[in-house]
Amino acid sequence: MSWVMVSPELVVAAAADLAGIGSAISSANAAAAVNTTGLLTAGADEVSTAIAALFGAQGQAYQAASAQAAAFYAQFVQALSAGGGAYAAAEAAAVSPLLAPINAQFVAATGRPLIGNGANGAPGTGANGGPGGWLIGNGGAGGSGAPGAGAGGNGGAGGLFGSGGAGGASTDVAGGAGGAGGAGGNAGMLFGAAGVGGVGGFSNGGATGGAGGAGGAGGLFGAGRERGSGGSGNLTGGAGGAGGNAGTLATGDGGAGGTGGASRSGGFGGAGGAGGDAGMFFGSGGSGGAGGISKSVGDSAAGGAGGAPGLIGNGGNGGNGGASTGGGDGGPGGAGGTGVLIGNGGNGGSGGTGATLGKAGIGGTGGVLLGLDGFTAPASTSPLHTLQQDVINMVNDPFQTLTGRPLIGNGANGTPGTGADGGAGGWLFGNGGNGGQGTIGGVNGGAGGAGGAGGILFGTGGTGGSGGPGATGLGGIGGAGGAALLFGSGGAGGSGGAGAVGGNGGAGGNAGALLGAAGAGGAGGAGAVGGNGGAGGNGGLFANGGAGGPGGFGSPAGAGGIGGAGGNGGLFGAGGTGGAGGGSTLAGGAGGAGGNGGLFGAGGTGGAGSHSTAAGVSGGAGGAGGDAGLLSLGASGGAGGSGGSSLTAAGVVGGIGGAGGLLFGSGGAGGSGGFSNSGNGGAGGAGGDAGLLVGSGGAGGAGASATGAATGGDGGAGGKSGAFGLGGDGGAGGATGLSGAFHIGGKGGVGGSAVLIGNGGNGGNGGNSGNAGKSGGAPGPSGAGGAGGLLLGENGLNGLM
């Protein structure tokens, strides 16, 4: 038996060399064509004319033969290049099955693979996301909570190299308390981003909003992640989740604390979450979350405390206290974190506006070697520390006068109730100041001030100020979070103010160019029409995009706000999770789209659509998953968000899964369709297509079942694979309704097709003819299996009826 050994790289390189040679010959022939095909006669006699015509004809014949040779040459080069690419792709495809038996042993022994991502928790179940592979893998996102105060699932932990999954959000359907958001998954033990905490559920007729989930902890060299915001409540808003702590060694900022949920009618806002602590050596503490707005005569909610820094880094700013619009006093600001060796103390949070301005939080003291105390820090009793502060202030004075910002130190907080912007941090290092809360008392609420930018070397951007409530008009827009520059996290966007139309949340600040987390978007304000959530900030070199803010609650006869889009990931970062749609007694808000991954990053998960409790009105559609980066190696597109449930109207469609990278990466799964209590079930979203070369198509989302005399939702189609990979399975159709309903089950989704080598995806099963054993109409048609690859692969199996 003879053996053939091929180096794909050498074949491709040889094809490129041959293409260059062919191009040079073609250029030479073209240059000679003018002088060889149209010769001038030497004289006017017949002999000269005949000689010129003879040589011209020979030149034309040569050019025709050269054109045929060039076409053959081009075909040869193309075949050689395609052969090299096919060898390379075949090698990549042959390597993939070798991992399956290795992973199977790890799964059997430990419950998680060696390499691979954890599965997402199913939407509407509150299931936890699966952990990523021990070596490489991202944790799965927690499932959104079940209707009726179900808590969101926790995100799965990342592997040694990998990011934690996002915690699941929760939204209520009927009267009752909102469910708590799930905790974000911890990052990989070495590198990777922690998962963002889930948003607490709105109370839709109940008293209390759900608490936001805590942000995940960073890995050994990673930053903590921002937390979930508390949900708004009829009486009491949910507390914001605590920011995640950074990794134990080296670098990493603490995650920002969550914003407390607002009270919608005569109660108290939720307290802001505490900022997470930074890594041991380098990193700034996370900013505390702002307190939620209260509508009671009592004191409003307090802002969260800022986190502790590393040996080098700034203490986190305290969160602003919540405002009171019911005649009560403003909430106290959170305390700033204290510097350790080199770094400023965090600013104390500003007190909230109200009948009496809330007390400002206590500022943190600066580092022992170098650092300025945060604003509102107590007077020092140490002569040495006092001398240090005096010297730094003397150095800062000319910089402050000439440029409006100090050399070392934090920017000042914007004055509460004015919507003033926070000051920028020092030119060398310092946190940006928090934006001031918007004005209160007018027809329209005032916009919140923008957070100040962080210091050039290191520093966290300030949190945007909350928008002021509008008496009968528009709620104020939340201020944008301040951006970090080199090392540092972006500030969270401020929440929108309540009004007849809720104000939109502010955009999160961008992460530092080198290290740091992006800021989350602010929550939309409540109103007859809820405000839209703010977009998450964009990540830096290694950072994920910030999560989009949740949409505002729409009450009593308006629509919920749209969730904010997740921010785009940095070069190696994943896209941020889209914000959940705002709850409503009428039309639920749509989920925000997941952010796109950086050049090498995965796409973000789309936000879940919110539920609707009004007859004849649909819930919000699920947000689309973000696309993976163009050159992502194995990273997937983000999963689409699930559609919100409806009372009597037809369920809404789930979000479309994000596409894989340009060459590599699998498509994201489609979101499940929205459930309907008596209307047709919503269709599942289509799975995303894989990268062109290697990757599997995303699975289609499941169609939702119907409980009344209605038709189940169709399953989403599976995504198309790359040249080497499996087509995505089609989603299952939803079941029909109760006894006596002469409707059919939902149609199963069509399986995705493979391209060159790989099996087609299986078609989805048709929906059952009746739920829970009830007799109903006909079962739904099954989905057809996808076509197998042209060179090697089987067609997918058709779904069952």
UniProtKB/Swiss-Prot annotation:
* Residue intervals of the PE domain: 1-93
Among its keywords, does the record have Repeat? yes
Q: Source organism's superkingdom? A: Bacteria
- Enumerate the UniProt keywords alphabetically: Repeat
Say which family it is in. Belongs to the mycobacterial PE family. PGRS subfamily.
The name of this protein is Uncharacterized PE-PGRS family protein PE_PGRS10
Q: What organism is this sequence from?
A: Mycobacterium tuberculosis (strain ATCC 25618 / H37Rv)
The primary gene name is: PE_PGRS10
